[in-house]
Amino acid sequence: MSARSDVTYVYDGSFEGLLTAVFESFESRELPCSIVAEDEFAPTLFACKTVDTDPQKADRVRRGLKNVSADVWNAVRLGYLTCVEDRGTLINDFVHMVMHYGAGVMRMLADDTVSRLTKAVRALKQESHKYTGFVRFSISEDNTLTSIIEPKNSVLPLLAPHFCDRYPNESFLIYDKTHSQALVWHNRQKMIIPLDGFEQPQAGDEELYFRALWKHFYDTVAIEARYNPRCRMNFMPKRYWNQLPEMDESNSPDAVRGVKRIGA
């Protein structure tokens, strides 16, 4: 492997930009001390190198990794979506190991680089799986479904196949508040777009009615004698609760008791 240098690579934050930075590392025959996105970069006393995204260079890295093995490519592709510390540097170090050891690098779990990346990807998959059950949609007046989530990792690309297949004829938006981006599904077209400061439309009477019904159902099916908050937090950690209507006491069934449902 190349020698570690004191240079920091700064890229535009995109996956193509990261792959370009990896290419530059190989071309320069150096392992930069850090590879960071420009929005995460902090001034340093050491030399910095701005890497301009080059689709052709990125594609060469992509094709090279795919030629090694699908597992290697998926580790890099999914690693980019994780919240692991110093993600760009970790992925670059991993790619250098891949070029040295080949596909067998995936079995080198005792190595710190491989271990950290593997654990980060596993955490990403686990979090995205949880969100397939924890996403709660609200319906707006134009019949668009909206939801807000606050994940640690960038889970929207992994959630897209599940929800697009589940609601093929609906229009919906899932807003990732942590990473300021949204998954949009409309007219059977999928997009993941940057989005800052999204606020859900004010809930109408119909929406409030069903929130209260769901809260009432959640409270009713609970078995008081088996109440175990620690067990519940193991399966449904508290950080997911902010966007769950069943955990919001304002959705009390008393608020709609005696209210006639619209259209009923």
Regions found by a protein language model. Give the residues of each.
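Long, compositionally biased intrinsically disordered terminal regions
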Residues: S171, A182-R188, E199-A264
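Acidic, Ser/Thr-rich peripheral helices and adjacent loops at domain boundaries
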Residues: D52-R60, Q189-A203
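N-terminal ordered "arm"
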Residues: S2-P55
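Short coil/turn segments at secondary-structure boundaries
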Residues: A75-G79, K177, R226-M233
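Short, hydrophobic/amphipathic alpha-helical patches that form generic packing surfaces
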Residues: G17-S28, D93-H100, L158-D165, R211-D219
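Charged, alpha-helical interface segments at or near domain boundaries
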Residues: V36-H129
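Internal, well-folded beta-alpha domain core
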Residues: G104-L195
